[in-house]
UniProtKB/Swiss-Prot annotation:
One Pfam family, short name: Epimerase
Signal peptide (UniProt feature, chain positions): none
Reaction(s) this enzyme catalyzes, per UniProt: a (2R,3S,4S)-leucoanthocyanidin + NADP(+) = a (2R,3R)-dihydroflavonol + NADPH + H(+); (2S)-flavan-4-ol + NADP(+) = (2S)-flavanone + NADPH + H(+)
Lineage of origin: Eukaryota, Viridiplantae, Streptophyta, Embryophyta, Tracheophyta
InterPro entries: Epimerase_deHydtase, NAD(P)-bd_dom_sf, NAD(P)_dehydrat-like
Biological pathway: Pigment biosynthesis; anthocyanin biosynthesis
The protein's name: Dihydroflavonol 4-reductase
GO process terms (BP): anthocyanin-containing compound biosynthetic process
Keyword Transmembrane helix: no
Family, per entry: Belongs to the NAD(P)-dependent epimerase/dehydratase family. Dihydroflavonol-4-reductase subfamily.
GO MF terms, alphabetically ordered: dihydrokaempferol 4-reductase activity; flavanone 4-reductase activity
Name of the gene: A
Enzyme class name: oxidoreductase
Amino acid sequence: MVSSTINETLDGKHDINKVGQGETVCVTGASGFIGSWLIMRLLERGYTVRATVRDPDNTKKVQHLLDLPNAKTNLTLWKADLHEEGSFDAAVDGCTGVFHIATPMDFESKDPENEMIKPTINGMLDILKSCVKAKLRRVVFTSSGGTVNVEATQKPVYDETCWSALDFIRSVKMTGWMYFVSKILAEQAAWKYAAENNLEFISIIPPLVVGPFIMPSMPPSLITALSPITRTESHYTIIKQGQFVHLDDLCMSHIFLYENPKANGRYIASACAATIYDIAKMLREEYPEYNVPTKFKDYKEDMGQVQFSSKKLTDLGFEFKYGLKDMYTAAVESCRAKGLLPLSLEHHLCVFRVTLIFFK
Protein backbone atom coordinates (compact mmCIF):
# COMPACT_ATOMS: atom_id res chain seq x y z
CA MET A 1 0.00 0.00 0.00
CA VAL A 2 0.98 3.65 -0.33
CA SER A 3 3.11 4.51 2.71
CA SER A 4 1.98 6.92 5.43
CA THR A 5 5.02 9.08 4.63
CA ILE A 6 3.75 9.58 1.09
CA ASN A 7 0.20 10.28 2.25
CA GLU A 8 1.46 12.89 4.72
CA THR A 9 3.50 14.52 1.95
CA LEU A 10 0.48 14.83 -0.33
CA ASP A 11 -2.30 15.75 2.09
CA GLY A 12 -4.26 18.79 0.94
CA LYS A 13 -2.24 19.44 -2.21
CA HIS A 14 -4.17 18.31 -5.30
CA ASP A 15 -7.94 17.86 -5.02
CA ILE A 16 -9.12 14.48 -6.33
CA ASN A 17 -12.57 14.38 -7.95
CA LYS A 18 -14.22 11.22 -9.29
CA VAL A 19 -14.51 12.59 -12.83
CA GLY A 20 -13.12 9.47 -14.49
CA GLN A 21 -15.87 7.07 -13.46
CA GLY A 22 -17.03 4.96 -16.39
CA GLU A 23 -13.97 5.78 -18.48
CA THR A 24 -11.21 3.31 -19.34
CA VAL A 25 -7.66 4.47 -20.07
CA CYS A 26 -4.40 2.67 -20.80
CA VAL A 27 -1.07 3.53 -19.15
CA THR A 28 2.14 2.20 -20.72
CA GLY A 29 5.28 1.79 -18.64
CA ALA A 30 2.97 1.18 -15.71
CA SER A 31 5.42 -0.22 -13.19
CA GLY A 32 7.88 2.68 -13.39
CA PHE A 33 8.42 5.89 -11.43
CA ILE A 34 5.91 8.03 -13.33
CA GLY A 35 3.57 5.27 -14.51
CA SER A 36 2.84 3.80 -11.08
CA TRP A 37 2.15 7.20 -9.52
CA LEU A 38 -0.08 8.24 -12.42
CA ILE A 39 -2.07 5.03 -12.05
CA MET A 40 -2.57 5.73 -8.34
CA ARG A 41 -3.98 9.16 -9.18
CA LEU A 42 -6.17 7.85 -12.03
CA LEU A 43 -7.65 5.19 -9.75
CA GLU A 44 -8.38 7.82 -7.10
CA ARG A 45 -10.14 9.84 -9.78
CA GLY A 46 -12.43 6.94 -10.67
CA TYR A 47 -10.87 5.76 -13.91
CA THR A 48 -10.65 2.11 -14.91
CA VAL A 49 -6.99 1.57 -15.82
CA ARG A 50 -5.34 -0.93 -18.12
CA ALA A 51 -1.68 -1.02 -17.16
CA THR A 52 0.83 -2.43 -19.64
CA VAL A 53 3.95 -4.17 -18.38
CA ARG A 54 6.42 -6.53 -20.01
CA ASP A 55 5.64 -9.40 -17.62
CA PRO A 56 2.39 -9.27 -15.61
CA ASP A 57 3.42 -12.45 -13.77
CA ASN A 58 6.59 -10.92 -12.33
CA THR A 59 5.22 -10.21 -8.86
CA LYS A 60 8.39 -8.42 -7.75
CA LYS A 61 7.89 -5.76 -10.43
CA VAL A 62 4.09 -5.37 -10.34
CA GLN A 63 2.99 -5.98 -6.74
CA HIS A 64 3.18 -2.26 -5.92
CA LEU A 65 0.51 -1.71 -8.59
CA LEU A 66 -1.75 -4.49 -7.31
CA ASP A 67 -1.52 -3.04 -3.79
CA LEU A 68 -2.87 0.38 -4.82
CA PRO A 69 -6.28 1.48 -3.47
CA ASN A 70 -9.09 0.48 -5.89
CA ALA A 71 -6.72 -1.76 -7.86
CA LYS A 72 -8.78 -4.91 -7.24
CA THR A 73 -11.82 -3.45 -8.97
CA ASN A 74 -10.41 -0.88 -11.42
CA LEU A 75 -6.94 -2.07 -12.48
CA THR A 76 -5.91 -4.82 -14.88
CA LEU A 77 -2.41 -5.73 -16.05
CA TRP A 78 -1.72 -6.32 -19.74
CA LYS A 79 1.38 -7.82 -21.32
CA ALA A 80 2.95 -5.51 -23.94
CA ASP A 81 6.47 -4.71 -25.13
CA LEU A 82 7.83 -1.83 -27.21
CA HIS A 83 9.96 -4.37 -29.09
CA GLU A 84 6.93 -6.44 -30.21
CA GLU A 85 4.81 -5.04 -33.03
CA GLY A 86 1.08 -5.08 -32.32
CA SER A 87 1.50 -6.06 -28.67
CA PHE A 88 -0.43 -2.97 -27.46
CA ASP A 89 -3.51 -3.60 -29.66
CA ALA A 90 -5.46 -5.60 -27.08
CA ALA A 91 -4.72 -3.27 -24.16
CA VAL A 92 -5.68 -0.14 -26.11
CA ASP A 93 -8.83 -1.53 -27.77
CA GLY A 94 -11.88 -0.27 -25.87
CA CYS A 95 -10.06 2.62 -24.15
CA THR A 96 -10.97 6.29 -24.53
CA GLY A 97 -7.41 7.47 -23.93
CA VAL A 98 -3.79 6.41 -23.61
CA PHE A 99 -0.98 7.77 -21.42
CA HIS A 100 2.23 6.67 -23.13
CA ILE A 101 5.10 6.69 -20.64
CA ALA A 102 7.05 3.52 -21.48
CA THR A 103 10.56 4.12 -22.80
CA PRO A 104 13.78 2.08 -22.80
CA MET A 105 16.24 3.41 -20.19
CA ASP A 106 19.78 2.06 -20.30
CA PHE A 107 22.52 4.68 -20.11
CA GLU A 108 25.14 1.89 -20.12
CA SER A 109 23.94 0.29 -23.39
CA LYS A 110 26.69 -0.97 -25.71
CA ASP A 111 24.37 -0.63 -28.72
CA PRO A 112 22.17 2.42 -28.04
CA GLU A 113 20.90 2.73 -31.62
CA ASN A 114 19.32 -0.74 -31.55
CA GLU A 115 18.64 -1.10 -27.83
CA MET A 116 17.22 2.36 -27.06
CA ILE A 117 16.75 4.70 -30.00
CA LYS A 118 15.06 2.47 -32.59
CA PRO A 119 12.81 0.66 -30.06
CA THR A 120 11.62 4.02 -28.67
CA ILE A 121 10.69 5.34 -32.12
CA ASN A 122 9.19 2.09 -33.40
CA GLY A 123 7.35 1.50 -30.13
CA MET A 124 5.87 4.99 -30.25
CA LEU A 125 4.56 4.50 -33.80
CA ASP A 126 3.25 1.03 -32.97
CA ILE A 127 1.26 2.38 -30.01
CA LEU A 128 -0.16 5.20 -32.14
CA LYS A 129 -1.25 2.64 -34.74
CA SER A 130 -3.08 0.78 -31.96
CA CYS A 131 -4.71 4.07 -30.94
CA VAL A 132 -5.91 4.79 -34.48
CA LYS A 133 -7.40 1.29 -34.74
CA ALA A 134 -9.19 1.77 -31.41
CA LYS A 135 -10.57 5.20 -32.44
CA LEU A 136 -9.83 6.59 -28.99
CA ARG A 137 -10.20 10.20 -27.91
CA ARG A 138 -6.73 11.39 -26.96
CA VAL A 139 -3.11 10.30 -26.48
CA VAL A 140 -0.91 11.97 -23.84
CA PHE A 141 2.81 11.31 -24.32
CA THR A 142 5.49 11.81 -21.67
CA SER A 143 8.35 13.47 -23.53
CA SER A 144 11.50 14.84 -21.87
CA GLY A 145 13.22 18.11 -21.08
CA GLY A 146 16.08 16.60 -23.05
CA THR A 147 14.09 17.31 -26.23
CA VAL A 148 14.20 21.06 -25.56
CA ASN A 149 17.49 22.48 -24.30
CA VAL A 150 20.42 20.18 -25.04
CA GLU A 151 22.72 22.36 -27.14
CA ALA A 152 26.17 23.95 -27.04
CA THR A 153 25.11 27.25 -25.42
CA GLN A 154 22.21 27.54 -22.98
CA LYS A 155 19.52 30.19 -23.44
CA PRO A 156 18.10 31.94 -20.35
CA VAL A 157 14.58 30.60 -21.07
CA TYR A 158 13.19 27.69 -23.11
CA ASP A 159 9.61 27.09 -24.25
CA GLU A 160 7.66 24.53 -26.30
CA THR A 161 8.93 25.89 -29.63
CA CYS A 162 12.50 24.83 -28.78
CA TRP A 163 14.14 21.57 -29.86
CA SER A 164 17.50 20.17 -28.77
CA ALA A 165 20.37 19.98 -31.27
CA LEU A 166 20.64 16.37 -32.47
CA ASP A 167 24.02 16.81 -34.17
CA PHE A 168 25.46 18.33 -30.99
CA ILE A 169 24.10 15.51 -28.81
CA ARG A 170 25.44 12.77 -31.10
CA SER A 171 28.87 14.40 -31.31
CA VAL A 172 29.37 15.17 -27.60
CA LYS A 173 27.71 11.98 -26.26
CA MET A 174 27.13 13.38 -22.76
CA THR A 175 25.56 11.27 -19.98
CA GLY A 176 22.13 10.14 -21.19
CA TRP A 177 22.72 11.21 -24.80
CA MET A 178 20.96 8.16 -26.26
CA TYR A 179 17.87 8.87 -24.14
CA PHE A 180 17.72 12.46 -25.44
CA VAL A 181 18.05 11.30 -29.06
CA SER A 182 15.39 8.61 -28.64
CA LYS A 183 12.89 11.04 -27.11
CA ILE A 184 13.48 13.73 -29.75
CA LEU A 185 13.08 11.39 -32.71
CA ALA A 186 10.12 9.54 -31.17
CA GLU A 187 8.21 12.74 -30.44
CA GLN A 188 8.89 14.19 -33.88
CA ALA A 189 7.76 10.95 -35.52
CA ALA A 190 4.63 10.98 -33.35
CA TRP A 191 3.65 14.52 -34.37
CA LYS A 192 3.97 13.56 -38.04
CA TYR A 193 1.95 10.36 -37.63
CA ALA A 194 -0.75 12.04 -35.53
CA ALA A 195 -1.22 14.80 -38.13
CA GLU A 196 -1.45 12.29 -40.98
CA ASN A 197 -3.99 10.13 -39.12
CA ASN A 198 -6.10 12.85 -37.44
CA LEU A 199 -5.15 11.59 -33.98
CA GLU A 200 -5.50 13.92 -30.99
CA PHE A 201 -1.99 13.92 -29.52
CA ILE A 202 -0.49 15.92 -26.64
CA SER A 203 3.07 15.82 -25.37
CA ILE A 204 4.15 16.79 -21.87
CA ILE A 205 7.77 17.88 -21.44
CA PRO A 206 8.98 17.29 -17.89
CA PRO A 207 12.40 18.37 -16.66
CA LEU A 208 14.05 16.25 -13.95
CA VAL A 209 11.29 14.53 -11.97
CA VAL A 210 11.85 14.39 -8.20
CA GLY A 211 9.67 13.27 -5.31
CA PRO A 212 8.31 10.27 -3.39
CA PHE A 213 7.69 7.03 -5.24
CA ILE A 214 5.82 3.73 -5.11
CA MET A 215 8.10 1.45 -7.13
CA PRO A 216 10.45 -0.76 -5.07
CA SER A 217 13.73 0.19 -6.78
CA MET A 218 15.57 3.51 -7.21
CA PRO A 219 14.07 5.60 -10.05
CA PRO A 220 16.73 6.61 -12.61
CA SER A 221 15.87 10.30 -12.28
CA LEU A 222 16.59 10.18 -8.54
CA ILE A 223 20.04 8.74 -9.20
CA THR A 224 20.65 12.05 -10.97
CA ALA A 225 18.75 14.29 -8.55
CA LEU A 226 20.49 12.85 -5.48
CA SER A 227 23.95 12.69 -7.05
CA PRO A 228 25.35 15.40 -4.70
CA ILE A 229 24.54 13.05 -1.81
CA THR A 230 25.86 9.87 -3.45
CA ARG A 231 28.78 11.68 -5.16
CA THR A 232 27.76 10.30 -8.58
CA GLU A 233 29.82 12.92 -10.42
CA SER A 234 28.92 11.76 -13.94
CA HIS A 235 25.37 13.05 -13.32
CA TYR A 236 26.38 16.50 -12.07
CA THR A 237 26.22 17.95 -15.59
CA ILE A 238 22.47 17.22 -15.77
CA ILE A 239 21.70 19.27 -12.65
CA LYS A 240 24.39 21.90 -13.20
CA GLN A 241 21.68 24.30 -14.43
CA GLY A 242 18.62 22.14 -13.93
CA GLN A 243 14.85 22.37 -14.02
CA PHE A 244 12.62 20.32 -11.74
CA VAL A 245 9.07 19.08 -11.18
CA HIS A 246 7.52 17.09 -8.34
CA LEU A 247 6.27 13.66 -9.43
CA ASP A 248 2.76 14.38 -8.16
CA ASP A 249 2.55 17.70 -10.03
CA LEU A 250 3.70 15.98 -13.20
CA CYS A 251 1.14 13.19 -12.95
CA MET A 252 -1.67 15.62 -12.17
CA SER A 253 -0.64 17.69 -15.21
CA HIS A 254 -1.05 14.56 -17.35
CA ILE A 255 -4.60 14.11 -16.08
CA PHE A 256 -5.34 17.83 -16.37
CA LEU A 257 -4.31 17.91 -20.04
CA TYR A 258 -6.13 14.68 -20.83
CA GLU A 259 -9.36 16.02 -19.37
CA ASN A 260 -9.12 19.59 -20.71
CA PRO A 261 -10.83 19.89 -24.13
CA LYS A 262 -8.79 23.02 -24.96
CA ALA A 263 -5.42 21.28 -24.58
CA ASN A 264 -3.34 20.86 -27.72
CA GLY A 265 0.30 20.58 -28.77
CA ARG A 266 3.36 20.49 -26.50
CA TYR A 267 3.36 21.52 -22.82
CA ILE A 268 6.37 22.08 -20.58
CA ALA A 269 5.65 21.00 -16.99
CA SER A 270 8.45 22.59 -14.96
CA ALA A 271 7.89 23.98 -11.47
CA CYS A 272 11.27 25.61 -10.85
CA ALA A 273 14.91 25.97 -11.86
CA ALA A 274 18.06 25.63 -9.74
CA THR A 275 21.80 25.25 -10.12
CA ILE A 276 23.78 22.44 -8.54
CA TYR A 277 24.92 24.98 -5.92
CA ASP A 278 21.29 25.81 -5.04
CA ILE A 279 20.59 22.10 -4.61
CA ALA A 280 23.73 21.48 -2.55
CA LYS A 281 22.94 24.40 -0.22
CA MET A 282 19.40 23.13 0.34
CA LEU A 283 20.59 19.56 0.97
CA ARG A 284 23.26 20.71 3.45
CA GLU A 285 20.61 22.62 5.39
CA GLU A 286 18.08 19.77 5.40
CA TYR A 287 20.49 16.83 5.69
CA PRO A 288 23.83 17.91 7.21
CA GLU A 289 24.59 14.25 7.93
CA TYR A 290 25.36 13.70 4.22
CA ASN A 291 28.13 16.32 4.18
CA VAL A 292 27.15 17.41 0.65
CA PRO A 293 30.03 19.13 -1.20
CA THR A 294 30.30 22.92 -1.18
CA LYS A 295 32.35 23.09 -4.39
CA PHE A 296 31.90 21.41 -7.76
CA LYS A 297 34.89 21.28 -10.09
CA ASP A 298 34.49 23.15 -13.41
CA TYR A 299 31.21 24.80 -12.32
CA LYS A 300 31.16 28.48 -11.37
CA GLU A 301 29.16 29.38 -8.28
CA ASP A 302 27.66 32.45 -9.95
CA MET A 303 26.36 30.68 -13.06
CA GLY A 304 22.78 31.66 -13.81
CA GLN A 305 19.70 29.48 -13.74
CA VAL A 306 18.20 28.19 -17.00
CA GLN A 307 14.41 28.41 -16.98
CA PHE A 308 11.81 26.20 -18.66
CA SER A 309 8.65 28.27 -19.21
CA SER A 310 5.44 26.51 -18.14
CA LYS A 311 3.34 29.55 -19.09
CA LYS A 312 1.34 27.64 -21.69
CA LEU A 313 0.32 25.07 -19.06
CA THR A 314 -0.43 27.54 -16.26
CA ASP A 315 -2.35 29.83 -18.64
CA LEU A 316 -4.67 26.86 -19.25
CA GLY A 317 -5.35 26.73 -15.50
CA PHE A 318 -2.87 24.23 -14.07
CA GLU A 319 -1.24 25.08 -10.73
CA PHE A 320 2.02 23.60 -9.42
CA LYS A 321 1.75 22.66 -5.74
CA TYR A 322 5.34 21.78 -4.81
CA GLY A 323 8.70 23.55 -4.65
CA LEU A 324 12.27 22.26 -4.80
CA LYS A 325 12.52 21.56 -1.05
CA ASP A 326 9.26 19.56 -1.14
CA MET A 327 10.58 17.46 -4.02
CA TYR A 328 13.93 16.67 -2.46
CA THR A 329 12.82 15.95 1.09
CA ALA A 330 10.09 13.61 -0.18
CA ALA A 331 12.59 11.83 -2.44
CA VAL A 332 15.17 11.40 0.33
CA GLU A 333 12.59 10.12 2.82
CA SER A 334 11.20 7.62 0.29
CA CYS A 335 14.70 6.35 -0.47
CA ARG A 336 15.51 6.02 3.23
CA ALA A 337 12.24 4.21 3.94
CA LYS A 338 13.02 1.67 1.19
CA GLY A 339 16.64 1.24 2.26
CA LEU A 340 17.93 2.77 -0.97
CA LEU A 341 19.86 5.61 0.66
CA PRO A 342 22.11 5.46 3.76
CA LEU A 343 21.09 7.47 6.81
CA SER A 344 24.35 9.40 6.68
CA LEU A 345 27.60 9.66 4.74
CA GLU A 346 29.41 8.00 7.66
CA HIS A 347 27.01 5.04 7.52
CA HIS A 348 27.57 4.78 3.77
CA LEU A 349 31.36 4.74 4.21
CA CYS A 350 31.14 2.14 6.99
CA VAL A 351 29.13 -0.19 4.76
CA PHE A 352 31.63 0.42 1.96
CA ARG A 353 34.60 -0.43 4.24
CA VAL A 354 32.91 -3.61 5.52
CA THR A 355 32.23 -4.66 1.93
CA LEU A 356 35.90 -4.15 1.01
CA ILE A 357 37.07 -6.20 4.01
CA PHE A 358 34.59 -8.98 3.20
CA PHE A 359 35.79 -9.32 -0.39
CA LYS A 360 39.54 -9.19 0.40
